[in-house]
Amino acid sequence: MDSWEDFLVEDPAKPAEFDFPLGKDSQSSSKPKKRFDDEEDEDEEENKESLQNDSHSVSQKSSSSSQNDQGSNKMTRIQQKIQERNFEKAIKASEAAAKEESLESSKEAMRQAEIDSDLANAMDLFDIVDKNSASANRSKQADQRQLKTKADYAAFQADILKKVKNCQTTAEYNNFVQDLIPLLLTGLNATNLKAVQKSVNKLVVNKEQQEKTQSKRGAAAPAAKPVSTAAPSKKGGKPTVNVNSKKTVADKSAYEDYIEDEYDDYADDFDDFM
């Protein structure tokens, strides 16, 4: 038997409810959908992964930027080292060139000092430079003194002869002449050297004849005996040589004249040479 509840009359004041499919879907969509626990865990994991990916990308960007900075800094340091090495090489090359130039200049200065010293010694020997002048200025004064005219050379020749006049008998004079003459002749040409050789050969011949004559006279001349003051004996005595006789004096004067002539010839030859 049916119940009375099945036959209840609806309240006319209450609006009737109708089922609209679209309306239900819209209402259901507006309401939050209930989610299960495993779905929430998956969403959290996805969020974590996305955050990790974002952080990883950020770290990669930062690391790449830092690597770029490090690479640029490294290249800068390499360029600086290359520049420093090139600069050091340039300094070493300059120092080597300066050292080589200083060595050459020092060698040239040493050679010039030796030349100046030799010249100063020669000037001292010939007494050409003023005695009151300082020795440091002697070479400079010698350079300033120029021999141009024949009179200048004649005066220079007179100075030389005056200087060597009293030292011809010394032991070092022979070596001095042998060392000096070749140095004086180095600036002459072959023709002038032959003329000098001719004058020297003539002087050699004259010296040989003079020495030969002196040796013959020395061997033939008898030893001088003193004049006896005792009374002559009855027997015939041996003749004696009177060194004070006119003939002996004449022979001596002739020999002296010969020596003077030879010296004059030598002086004339020397004048012609100069």
Swiss-Prot record:
Main location: cytoplasm
Any one Gene Ontology BP term: maturation of SSU-rRNA
InterPro entries xrefs: eIF3-like_dom_sf, eIF3j
Transmembrane segments: none
Region spans: Disordered: 1-110, 207-245
GO CC terms in record: eukaryotic 43S preinitiation complex; eukaryotic 48S preinitiation complex; eukaryotic translation initiation factor 3 complex; eukaryotic translation initiation factor 3 complex, eIF3m
Protein's job: Component of the eukaryotic translation initiation factor 3 (eIF-3) complex, which is involved in protein synthesis of a specialized repertoire of mRNAs and, together with other initiation factors, stimulates binding of mRNA and methionyl-tRNAi to the 40S ribosome. The eIF-3 complex specifically targets and initiates translation of a subset of mRNAs involved in cell proliferation.
Name of the protein in its database record: Probable eukaryotic translation initiation factor 3 subunit J
Species of provenance: Schizosaccharomyces pombe (strain 972 / ATCC 24843) (Fission yeast)
